[in-house]
Amino acid sequence: QQENDPSESKLDLSLCAQRLLLMGCEYVLITGTHENTQQVRNTLFASSGIIRTDDWERLEHTYHGSGCTLASAIAASLANGLSVSDSVLEAQDYTWHTLQAGFRPGMGQYIPNRLFWANDEEDSEDEHEEKEVIIEQPEN
């Protein structure tokens, strides 16, 4: 098999997940963010096998904070009572949208916009345009 053969990669990732599960983890989520593919494939494993596999459109930039965003979103979903499988799906969806709305504050990687849902249509058209804010003082 070739070095970049997807079937070999999937087998290797399954073995990695099984090793982590044998060390005491209940679940292992392996993400495909660093693969050279058009889709990002994330797979959730348990001792019983694969729980779910989700494919996401690969975005064009590189990001700093995507893994932290995903882990935090999973934890928040679990804390709100969702099942592990549903938490992973919801967190992936949230994370993908934060990346899609991400921004580049300087010359480095893009940063997830974790408040993407709070942006209105005008803000998303030109995020860098300065907005004039007028605060009216109450009359005494």
Q: For the regions a protein language model found, what residue spans apply to each?
A:
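Glycine-rich beta-alpha junction loops
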Residues: 32-36, 57-60, 92-95
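Conserved phosphate/ATP/ADP-binding segment of small-molecule kinases
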Residues: 1-51
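Residue-level signal for inorganic ion chemistry
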Residues: 31, 67, 87
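Short, small-residue alpha-helix embedded
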Residues: 61-84
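Short pre-catalytic strand/loop immediately N-terminal to key active-site residues, enriched for Gly-Thr
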Residues: 50-64
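Phosphate-handling active-site elements
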Residues: 50-52, 77-91
